[in-house]
Structures are given as structure tokens and as C-alpha cells.
Regions:
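Short helix/loop segments within enzyme catalytic domains
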Residues: 90-93
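Active-site recognition of the HExxH zinc-binding catalytic motif
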Residues: 53-65
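Active-site scaffold of zinc-dependent metalloenzymes
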Residues: 1-51, 65-66, 72-81, 85
Length: 93
């Protein structure tokens, strides 16, 4: 469990074919953030740098929900991808 802006979140590792990893368009992905359950679902097949990237991406969604940001989903996805790739470098400056 972790908190962002006093909102408690959980991380669950699930089977790569789990319904929990299904996107709204019906495709399966590697990670999903579920606001209603305050849970990040990650494929248990992830490891190493890919796990770090997917988790970082999902944490952006957690922060967006926790701070009640209303960002269009296509923009939020771009921000999440950017931070998952370059966030450590930006923060480390």
C-alpha cells in the first residue's frame, strides 16, 4: 500500500491474461490503474526495466486521480509515457 495526496493505493501482480489488465477497448495490456478500486494491476510477467517503466507509467495515473486532475486521456497517456521514460533523469537534475 502507498499514498498519494492521502489517497491509499494498492499494487497487485496478476496473471498476464487477467481481466484486470483489460483496457476499455478490450485489449490486454501490461498495467492498469483502477480508480474505483484504488489499485494498480501489473502483469506478473514483468521484471527489470520494463517493470519499472510500466509501474512509473501507472503511478502517473494514480497521481492524476489522487489530485483530481482532469486531463484528457490521450494527453495523460503522453505525460505518463514521458515520465516513465525520462522522469528519473528530470528529477535527478
Amino acid at each position: 500500500m502507498f499514498k498519494i495526496n492521502d489517497v491509499e493505493w494498492n499494487i497487485l501482480y496478476v496473471n498476464p491474461n487477467s481481466e484486470c489488465l483489460m483496457r476499455s477497448d478490450g485489449t490486454i495490456t501490461l498495467g492498469v490503474t483502477d480508480w474505483s478500486k484504488r489499485t494498480v494491476y501489473l502483469s506478473n510477467a514483468l521484471s527489470g526495466s520494463l517493470l519499472e517503466k510500466v509501474l512509473s507509467h501507472e503511478l502517473v495515473h494514480c497521481a492524476s486521480f489522487s489530485y483530481d486532475c482532469h486531463i484528457p486521456i490521450n494527453v495523460e497517456e503522453i505525460v505518463a509515457d514521458f515520465l516513465s521514460l525520462y522522469g528519473k533523469e528530470v528529477v535527478g537534475i
